[in-house]
């Protein structure tokens, strides 16, 4: 009997092991092109047990159910449900998806409840989506935000042209007013709301899906989605086994090598994904060399159908030379040829000892660690949580110091030029070491005593402005299905941020040391010989900060605590889907000034404004309310509407203005009200979407540094800025047949400032109040009503064609049009000219093109050849202007109707890249 029991136990164990090892495999392809779909989502219906397809469109999913239904969804394709039956513990499913539109129909990865991806003909928001395959094929040497330029109301530029220095505007709102999420985690800076794309230069390599929700968006969180939300979903650990190796080359020495591999999920539920890449070379602008590495590792564990966990770490340490300051059109022309501007010209560098040297250099490493947990409590309830941490370390370098000529005017290193427009570094160093220098009309005498010494006001040197941080947070979401059509979700959003802001010497340029008197708590003056490293630390757990003794000019830390509560009620039927969302948060701000002597007065003669080194936390509440509905009239027509109101806390520099530990006396939340109407039409081969929107934004705050009044450096703070952004958007796609497809979009906006705002001016040297020439007080009103919102094109259009002459070969061409592009708000001109109007930049057309050919071989392998050319016709155009100088009686010359004194960035000329990709 004992022996029989033994064998029965073994048999039972074997049967259980067999059941636990049941596997569903398959491939997901595009029905029309027959191309595999990377990142398609395969879900066992009724559960949260799902997986993403790999580069070959393959998936492998374990289950204990012999029968069931697979739900397959992917970007821009119709969701499909496929029944399966296991035979011998296995099933192989081949799925082809039909094109729907260029939008997302569903994304299911770990932490799905926190992604807030919009679904077509369901979520009532304006949305555009780019899939992983398009990102891989079209990125090349483009900047990540530029992949979105075919989206309505999006204006993306390379700005100065440095690696990762691009920026993006949506509906006229800049980076700080666009919420960017990675796997549901908000990445906007907690002090100023900005997104520094340099810190995320490698994110494109690990992105499986990117979705732009224009307007207030569908996110449940209290986030900065005034203009829109960019949702980024990264690679999942549980993609089936396989990988890819690729190499890309481009203009100006650009190169990129990448290797990625997925283990697939084993029988015990473990899976892993790893990616490594290196990018280097230079961009189109002169002396913009760079080197960036990227690493990604994800480890997944799904012990059963109820639980799924994934740990991810990714980072992109990099350094790059910049073209930071916009350059006058006059100088572009001066260093150009035959009356044409030198679009590559960069004024921020020169040769030092025969090697290139840039005053503007950016170095950063921002690793991010995330742990996601999905818990399927029952068929009607689920729980999702993500915890994250990041230790950002880095800086941007800049000029420091100056000389004084006989007239009392400051002469900066940037004024000492060679005949070809470069900074004369040899002359800079000779001056620092005691030699006199000649400038037009006079000689400037250097008197180092007893040795060459640099300060913030004399001598020439290079400094770094450190902007490092420690960032921790968590998000949690509970979702309960109340009935077949009604569901409710609620969650928490907690964050803590500590920002480190200070300056340190970077290169003494022949001086012996920097003499600093800024830290009032140390013996004065201090001799600082330390210089910061010019390359990033590769340690993802680096939490070091330079000691106070090595910090100069200023040193302040900003602490931000954030706690939010959010909820959503959603009703969905085949015809109607509607939602109501609310979120509330409390942000608490603290400022620590390491150089401040306790008791210093914020306002002269006002004892009640005495400051401490460390302020208490100032808590400010805020909230969001949103609602919307989509109605599917029939299979071809749908309409939607949404409305929302934000009461958003001011940014850190509005809470503690004027760079002081002095709380702003009248703190007011920014107020945003948005409303949107939309219509969609679709057939089997045609789809179009039309949107109308209006956003009112009140009580905005802006601070503008580095302004000049004659020979005095000052900065301005504007309070109470009001804006109206309204417009219309259209996007469409038409597939003629399997060989030809057209896509297009058009957007037109009217984005204007309203009424007056209050301006306050301060000296840059000591942050005291400053009265501008011609003014009687440091505080006065300025009229904004004649100005357009700048830095973004009010009108854009795009038309593209995709041609597939034969299987696996594709040609794409696109035309892009920009008009009603205005200069950014020129605060320096505004505070001096009450009748200022906006400078309109010339309209322009651009053409881009690309080809790709995929050669499959073996069972699972392929080689793909890629080539892309941007700005095919080498069009010369102005992408943005920092100044607002209109043509008037004092204008000496113009370029395309623009005063040549304006400081602008020209767009890149013709650029190209070619690539080779091997998938296995």
Feature-to-residue mapping (PLM):
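Surface-exposed extracellular loop regions of Gram-negative outer-membrane beta-barrel proteins
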Residues: 327, 534-545, 588-609, 617, ...
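C-terminal beta-signal and adjacent terminal beta-strands/loops
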Residues: 741-742, 818-826, 854-920
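Short acidic/polar hinge/loop motifs at secondary-structure boundaries
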Residues: 60-62, 167, 186-214
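Gram-negative outer-membrane beta-barrel transporters
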Residues: 572-575, 694-696, 717-827, 917-919
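Transmembrane beta-barrel wall of Gram-negative outer-membrane proteins
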Residues: 242-244, 249-280, 285-323, 368-380, ...
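Acidic/polar loop-and-plug regions of large Gram-negative outer-membrane beta-barrel proteins
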Residues: 300, 308-372, 395-464, 528-549, ...
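Short, acidic, small-residue-rich periplasmic hinge/interaction motif at the N-terminus
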Residues: 29-33, 40-45, 71-77, 87-137, ...
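A beta-strand signature from Gram-negative outer-membrane beta-barrel systems
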Residues: 93-95, 201-246
């Amino acid at each position: 009997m004992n022996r029989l029991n033994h064998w029965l136990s073994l048999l039972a164990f074997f049967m259980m092991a067999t059941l636990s090892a049941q596997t569903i495999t398959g491939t997901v392809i595009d029905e029309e092109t027959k191309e595999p779909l990377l990142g398609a989502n395969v879900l066992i219906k009724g559960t949260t047990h799902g997986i993403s397809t790999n580069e070959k469109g393959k998936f492998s999913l374990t289950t204990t159910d012999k029968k069931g239904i697979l739900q397959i969804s992917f970007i821009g394709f119709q969701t499909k449900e496929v029944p399966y039956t296991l035979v011998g513990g296995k099933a192989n499913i081949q799925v082809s998806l039909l094109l729907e539109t260029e939008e997302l129909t569903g994304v299911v990865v770990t932490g799905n409840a926190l992604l807030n991806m919009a679904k077509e003909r369901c979520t009532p928001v304006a949305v555009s989506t780019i899939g992983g395959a398009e990102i891989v094929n079209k990125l090349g040497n483009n900047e990540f935000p530029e992949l979105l330029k075919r989206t309505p109301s999006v204006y993306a530029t390379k700005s100065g042209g440095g690696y990762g220095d691009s920026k993006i505007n949506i509906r006229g709102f800049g980076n700080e007013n666009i919420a960017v999420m990675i796997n549901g985690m908000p990445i906007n800076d907690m002090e100023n709301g900005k997104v520094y794309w340099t810190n995320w230069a490698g994110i494109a390599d690990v992105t499986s899906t990117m979705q732009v929700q224009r307007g207030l968006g569908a996110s449940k969180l209290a986030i900065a989605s005034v203009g829109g939300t960019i949702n980024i979903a990264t690679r999942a650990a549980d993609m089936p086994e396989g990988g890819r190796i690729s190499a890309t080359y481009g203009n100006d020495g650009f190169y990129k090598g990448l290797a990625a591999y997925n283990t697939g999920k084993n029988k015990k539920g473990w899976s892993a994904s790893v990616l490594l890449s290196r990018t280097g070379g230079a961009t189109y602008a002169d002396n913009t060399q760079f080197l960036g590495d990227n690493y990604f590792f994800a480890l997944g564990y799904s012990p059963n159908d109820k639980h799924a966990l994934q740990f991810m770490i990714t980072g992109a340490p990099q350094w790059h030379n910049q073209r930071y300051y916009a350059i006058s059109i006059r100088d572009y022309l001066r260093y150009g040829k035959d009356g044409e501007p030198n679009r590559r010209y960069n004024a921020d560098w020169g040769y030092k000892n025969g090697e290139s040297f840039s005053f503007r250099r950016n170095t950063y490493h921002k690793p991010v660690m995330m742990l996601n947990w999905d818990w399927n409590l029952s068929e009607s309830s689920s729980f999702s949580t993500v915890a994250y941490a990041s230790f950002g370390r880095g800086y941007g370098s800049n000029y420091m110091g100056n000389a004084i000529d006989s007239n009392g005017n400051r002469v900066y290193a940037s004024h000492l030029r060679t005949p070809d427009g470069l900074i004369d570094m040899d002359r800079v160093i000779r001056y620092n070491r005691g030699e006199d220098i000649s400038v037009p009309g006079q000689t400037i005498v250097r008197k180092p005593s007893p040795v060459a010494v640099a300060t913030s006001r004399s001598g020439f040197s290079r400094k770094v402005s450190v902007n490092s941080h420690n960032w921790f947070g968590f998000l949690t979401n509970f979702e309960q299905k109340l009935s077949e059509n009604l569901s409710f979700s609620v969650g928490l959003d907690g964050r803590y941020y500590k920002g480190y802001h200070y300056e340190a010497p970077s290169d003494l340029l022949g001086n012996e040391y920097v003499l600093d008197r800024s830290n009032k708590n140390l013996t004065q003056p201090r001799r600082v010989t330390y210089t910061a490293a010019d390359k990033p630390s590769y340690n993802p757990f680096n939490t070091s900060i330079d000691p106070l003794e090595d910090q100069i000019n200023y040193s302040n830390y900003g602490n931000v605590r954030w706690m939010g509560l959010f909820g959503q009620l959603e009703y969905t039927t085949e015809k109607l889907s509607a939602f109501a969302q609310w979120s509330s948060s409390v942000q608490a701000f603290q400022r620590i000034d390491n150089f401040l002597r306790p008791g210093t007065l914020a306002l002269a003669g006002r004892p009640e404004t005495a400051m401490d080194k460390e302020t208490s936390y100032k808590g400010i509440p805020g909230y969001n309310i949103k609602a919307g509905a989509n109605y599917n009239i029939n299979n071809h027509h749908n309409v939607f509407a949404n409305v929302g109101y934000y009461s958003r806390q001011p940014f850190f520099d509005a809470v503690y203005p004027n760079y002081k530990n002095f709380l702003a006396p009248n703190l007011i939340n920014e107020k945003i009200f948005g409303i949107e109407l939309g219509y969609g039409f679709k057939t089997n081969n045609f789809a179009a979407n039309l949107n109308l929107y209006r956003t009112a934004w009140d009580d905005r705050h802006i601070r503008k540094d580095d302004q000049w009044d004659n020979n005095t450096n000052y900065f301005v703070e504007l309070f109470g800025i009001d804006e109206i952004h309204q417009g219309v958007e259209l996007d469409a796609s038409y597939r003629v047949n399997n060989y030809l497809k057209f896509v297009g979009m058009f957007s037109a906006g009217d984005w204007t400032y309203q009424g007056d705002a209050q301006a306050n001016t301060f000296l840059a040297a000591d942050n005291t109040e400053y009265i501008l020439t011609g003014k009687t007080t440091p505080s006065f009103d300025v009229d904004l009503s004649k100005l357009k919102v700048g830095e973004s094109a009010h009108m854009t259009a795009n038309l593209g064609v995709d041609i597939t002459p034969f299987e696996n070969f594709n040609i794409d061409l696109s035309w892009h049009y920009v008009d009603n592009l205005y200069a950014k708000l020129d605060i320096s001109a505004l505070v001096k000219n009450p009748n200022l109007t906006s400078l309109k930049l010339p309209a322009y057309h651009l053409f881009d093109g690309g080809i790709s050919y995929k050669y499959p071989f073996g069972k699972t392998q392929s080689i793909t050849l890629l080539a892309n050319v941007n700005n095919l016709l080498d069009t010369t155009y102005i992408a943005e202007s920092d100044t607002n100088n209109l043509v008037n009686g004092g204008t000496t010359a113009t370029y395309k109707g623009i005063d040549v004194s304006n400081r602008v960035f020209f767009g890149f000329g013709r650029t190209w890249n070619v690539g080779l990709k091997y998938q296995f």
